[in-house]
Amino acid sequence: MRARTLIATLLLQMVTACGGSAAEAPPPIPAPAGANAGIPFVANILVDQFGYRPNDPKVAVIRNPQTGYDSAQKFAPGSPYQVRRASDGTVVLSGALTPWNQGAVEASSGDNGWWFDFSSVVTPGAYFVYDKANNSRSAVFQIDQEVYKKILKAAMRMYFYQRSGFAKQRPYADTCWVDDPAYIGPNQDGQAHDVTDRDNTGKIRNLAGGWFDAGDTNKYVTFAVTPVHQLLTAYQATPRVFTDDFNIPESGNGIPDLIDEVKWETDWLKRMQYRDGSAALKVGEIVDALADPPSSDKNPRFYVPSCSSATIAVAGMFAHASFVFGSFPALSGEAADLRARASAAWKNYQSIDSKQTQCDTGAVRAGRADWNEQDQNAEAVVAAIYLFAITDNPEYADFVSAHHKELQPYRDVGWSRYKVEQGEALLFYAGLPHVDPKLRTSILADKLADVRAGNHVYGFVPDDDLYRAYIHDAQYHWGSNNPRANYGNSNLDVLALKLDPADSKRYETRALELLHYFHGVNPLGMVYLSNMYPYGASRSANEIYHTWFSHGTRWSDARSSACGPAPGYVPAGPNVFAVRDGVPSSLSPPAGQPAQKSYLDWNTGWPQSSWAITEPGIYYQSSYVELLSKFAQ
């Protein structure tokens, strides 16, 4: 019942921010002033709640629910619609609405609606969309060339808050989320025991550092693959947006803060590696325990020892990091060390005739971190790509030539919507100077063939989705926000590679609209980032499933708790298979809803299993960060 009350409140009332402070965020977007101050905000007039760059398309979506939990909340818009300046209410544009798809109900949301195009408004400032007949308005938004830069900083700071064994102290952490270093006590990460030989003190290892994987505080080598590669790829694509001022302890050291953050993770991965080049699989606990805050958890920590999946995973991550770190003179020694470690891991992996696929028994909670042999071999191609980039050794080029069609782009449409590091590595390889020209041509032709095949993955198609951000219904699974962001990243690859210059605007628009979906242009009218009120959101995710920000604590709810969760965490997203994943069928929403409404803003644990909907992950985060970074310049 509590969950139903929360979602009703979310849809009917304007949310008041509870968390955050001036130290954590920039000044919020100005609210309507003067005679406009009393105009109510409604979740039926949807815009990107942060805003738009001046020359980008700008289209508000006006929603009218037809099916689902909110079907009784009908909305009949007036005409004309206006864009008003927030500071004084001046009307800067007045125009008509366009019915979406001739008034049809969009099946995946259960809504019909209208579009209001205000792309002609380009002057920087704060605005809102106004329905005069209903005396209702959208969220206030900014038009500014750098409107997404502060959002990028907030999203990247999630990794700082996820650091294990590191103090979260002011001025780098807001007062609400100050915490002592976690897992530095006796028999914890600095003295982790082998879970397969728990009493053998000779196998105690220092495995401190790294990032908490998700809403739990465990650390997985194989789960780090996507975020490490994707963050490095994001930096390579748009280095100028990743500046040295993201308010982490390393800020101002002359190295971009994204690189500092990735190095925090690779430093831990180095501790996971054995002298023979192999790597341990994961670190965590053998009991389920809350950690609110993480420093309060004093349980002993254990590791799963050497496994071929972890070994080939670190080979790729070390090689990629070596390539990127090598461009910084201050990190030349680190780059050389990572190169040697990547080579050692590669050799160890290649020496194993029968790859290990059952290393993780589940004794260390919670997620199973094994890879099957097919996935290990695919990640070996990724490792070979980056090893070739840093060595020019033909051994690695030969391996890529022989095995590149084992990568995800050849198993699925959409190239990089899943296992994004594989598709992105292949495109990176095609751009290296000493690659076989025939293979380069073949890879780019295969990418273009994927684009030409369509499958509703590439390019903006107006009739596909009322909310302008189509993904297939099959992608509304646990973690749907991950492929959603990667649909955008795959479209932007087409632009970067200039594969279809005549149609370039369609790919950019598709990616932009997917970003706007994250920022509130969706059936919930909610920003899919936690507690973003200090950054100007009118309605953002208030609760996420995370052991630190757990149900009933001072960090539980951005509306009603003392603090709420830290800003900028990307939750898993709508999940039409929620009941299969443990959510009770009686809890509706998220159960029994159209795909886009298969979401509930809550964080209750067992037996409601909110982790299948609202748990964040370092891999969801990296997909969103990469997408956002392309527009933060």
Regions found by a protein language model. Give the residues of each.
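An active-site-proximal structural segment forming one wall of the substrate-binding cleft
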Residues: 258-276, 303-356, 396, 400-403
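Low-complexity, Pro/Ser/Thr- and charge-rich linker/hinge segments at domain boundaries
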Residues: 33-39, 137-176
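Aromatic (Trp/Tyr) and acidic
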Residues: 45-135, 160-225, 229, 267, ...
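Solenoid-like repeat scaffolds
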Residues: 405-413
